[in-house]
């Protein structure tokens, strides 16, 4: 099962301090808007999101249909099919993608330790 490009979304207290710290580790701004308190940073194929005041917990994120540079892949497993496969394996979902739609959609699962996992398709 290929879930798509992986990133981690980090809850931060001070987006400016976090940006400066991760830049010291070699990350560069790839997207987002610091004025809106969110940034996407990249170091090679590694992607992290910094979010101030948006989420309660850090989130593991998978993006079906994208590579690590947010480029659309020619072929991928649709988020609704991934949802069906995970439900068939007994994974409980907090939210579900609407099975009657196509294109962008998402669902959220939570691991046994309470870590949220979002599978978020943008294409």
Which residues make up each language-model segment?
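Conserved acetyl-CoA-binding loop of GNAT-fold acetyltransferases
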Residues: 23-30, 91
């Amino acid at each position: 099962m290929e879930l798509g490009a992986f990133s981690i979304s980090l809850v931060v207290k001070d987006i400016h301090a976090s940006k400066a710290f991760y830049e010291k580790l070699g990350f560069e701004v790839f997207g987002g808007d610091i004025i809106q308190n969110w940034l996407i940073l990249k170091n090679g194929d590694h992607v992290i999101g910094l979010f101030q005041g948006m989420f309660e917990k850090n989130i593991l994120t998978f993006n079906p249909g994208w590579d690590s540079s947010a480029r659309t892949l020619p072929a991928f497993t649709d988020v609704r099919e991934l949802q069906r496969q995970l439900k068939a394996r007994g994974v409980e979902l907090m939210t579900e993608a609407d099975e009657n739609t196509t294109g962008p959609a998402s669902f959220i699962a939570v691991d046994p330790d309470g870590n949220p996992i979002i599978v978020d398709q943008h294409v």
